[in-house]
């Protein structure tokens, strides 16, 4: 059973939330495209923007020169929605968003498959993934109709 993460736009804060898809979604396809995704600039990303990857549903920005702003992907491995690389992932994404790292598509795939997934499976920590909030991303990969409700309205 694969752990699924999805991003949802929080319009109140104009940010994307990266969060696990609820248990009720397991075993069913995530709504939304898994093929080529539309992009604001068709020249910014190749039409097959990484469709060969085993990680499905990566956002368009994952393959742009600016780097991924947030991620929604399906793991090919059996995992629960726990994270022990919770400090590494935001740092990598933030550096990519700032353009500080020129990760290729192959490097990006290797990071998830060999580093993040390995840490999840082997280190055995049980830190629950709540949400990653990464500002500035306008690639709206919403795979659930429900609004992002991680921020209490005060």
UniProtKB/Swiss-Prot annotation:
Q: What GO molecular function terms would the record report?
A: ubiquitin-like ligase-substrate adaptor activity
Cellular compartment(s) = Host cytoplasm; Host nucleus; Host mitochondrion
Q: Which UniProt keywords apply?
A: Activation of host NF-kappa-B by virus, Activator, Apoptosis, Host cytoplasm, Host G2/M cell cycle arrest by virus, Host mitochondrion, Host nucleus, Host-virus interaction, Modulation of host cell cycle by virus, Transcription, Transcription regulation
Under the heading Pfam families, the entry gives:
X
Query: Is the keyword RNA-binding in the record?
Result: no
One Gene Ontology CC term in the entry: host cell nucleus
- For the keyword Nucleus, the answer is no
One Gene Ontology BP term is: DNA-templated transcription
Region forming the signal peptide: none
Q: Which cysteines are joined by disulfide bonds?
A: none
Q: Annotated region Mitochondrial targeting sequence: where?
A: 68-117
- Post-translational modification (record): A fraction may be phosphorylated in insect cells and HepG2 cells, a human hepatoblastoma cell line. Phosphorylated in vitro by host protein kinase C or mitogen-activated protein kinase. N-acetylated in insect cells.
- Domain of life, source organism: Viruses
Q: Which InterPro entries match?
A: Transactivation_prot_X (IPR000236)
| Protein family (similarity comment) | Belongs to the orthohepadnavirus protein X family.
Please give the subunit comment from the record: May form homodimer. May interact with host CEBPA, CFLAR, CREB1, DDB1, E4F1, HBXIP, HSPD1/HSP60, NFKBIA, POLR2E and SMAD4. Interacts with host SMC5-SMC6 complex and induces its degradation. Interacts with host TRPC4AP; leading to prevent ubiquitination of TRPC4AP. Interacts with host PLSCR1; this interaction promotes ubiquitination and degradation of HBx and impairs HBx-mediated cell proliferation.
The function of this protein is: Multifunctional protein that plays a role in silencing host antiviral defenses and promoting viral transcription. Does not seem to be essential for HBV infection. May be directly involved in development of cirrhosis and liver cancer (hepatocellular carcinoma). Most of cytosolic activities involve modulation of cytosolic calcium. The effect on apoptosis is controversial depending on the cell types in which the studies have been conducted. May induce apoptosis by localizing in mitochondria and causing loss of mitochondrial membrane potential.
Instruction: Report what the protein is called.
Output: Protein X
Q: Source species, please?
A: Hepatitis B virus genotype C subtype ayr (isolate Human/Japan/Okamoto/-) (HBV-C)
